[in-house]
Amino acid sequence: MQRAARPLVSVSDLDADKAAALKLIPIPSALEARLDAYVALLQQWQAKTNLVAPSTLPQLWTRHVADSLQLVSLMPHARRWLDFGSGGGFPGVVLACAMADVGGHVTLVERIAKKAAFLREALRVAGAPGTVVLADIGDNVDRFPQALDCITARAVAPLHQLIGFAEPLMTPGITKALFLKGQDVDAELTESTKYWKFQPKLHASLTGGQGWIVEIDHIERRT
């Protein structure tokens, strides 16, 4: 007799983590339903494709979903988003779920075909407005939208590289970048100033820990 696969994380643990996440960032029921569909799909795919670190699965809602959702409050009027290196969909798919009721759209850039396939399925299942571009972040800039409100990235590359990827896509006075970073943010900022002129604004993550969001709205290359 074939045994059913054991759940990657218990339902009770995930429900408790979801409750904690929604206490941090309350959301409408329609958005909650879309995120539920996305999280369920991610758990299915995680069994065969490494989309998030397995150790973080019990904190999927607080560690990943809420961490991504907080970007919306920093750019409440943004409708045209681009997410570099979307991977398992954080923050790209979460942002797309949030854009469904406000007429927004998210472009998700991913270089690994298997993950890009997951992202497309996640957008479909969640009913979220987005487009997946299978590409390396540093290449094919002409394939990305040229009119953007916000560029995001999470756990993809060092800050100075992300700034370089974002710079040709940013329209002064319109586009901002929001990069989610960890405990090494100060060192990454110092390294980035060797190559770029910019005035970052730091936001402490609502999810606690040592997370930070680096907000940038103007970039100049040092000569």
Swiss-Prot record:
GO terms for molecular function: rRNA (guanine-N7-)-methyltransferase activity. S-adenosyl-L-methionine binds at G85, F90, R154. Its EC number is 2.1.1.170. Its main location: cytoplasm. It is found in: Cytoplasm. It comes from the Bacteria. Pfam families: GidB. It catalyses: guanosine(527) in 16S rRNA + S-adenosyl-L-methionine = N(7)-methylguanosine(527) in 16S rRNA + S-adenosyl-L-homocysteine. Keywords: Cytoplasm, Methyltransferase, rRNA processing, S-adenosyl-L-methionine, Transferase. The keyword rRNA-binding does not apply. GO terms for cellular component: cytosol. The keyword Methyltransferase applies. InterPro entries: rRNA_ssu_MeTfrase_G, SAM-dependent_MTases_sf. Belongs to the methyltransferase superfamily. RNA methyltransferase RsmG family. Specifically methylates the N7 position of guanine in position 527 of 16S rRNA. HAMAP family: 16SrRNA_methyltr_G. This is Ribosomal RNA small subunit methyltransferase G. It comes from Rhodopseudomonas palustris (strain TIE-1).
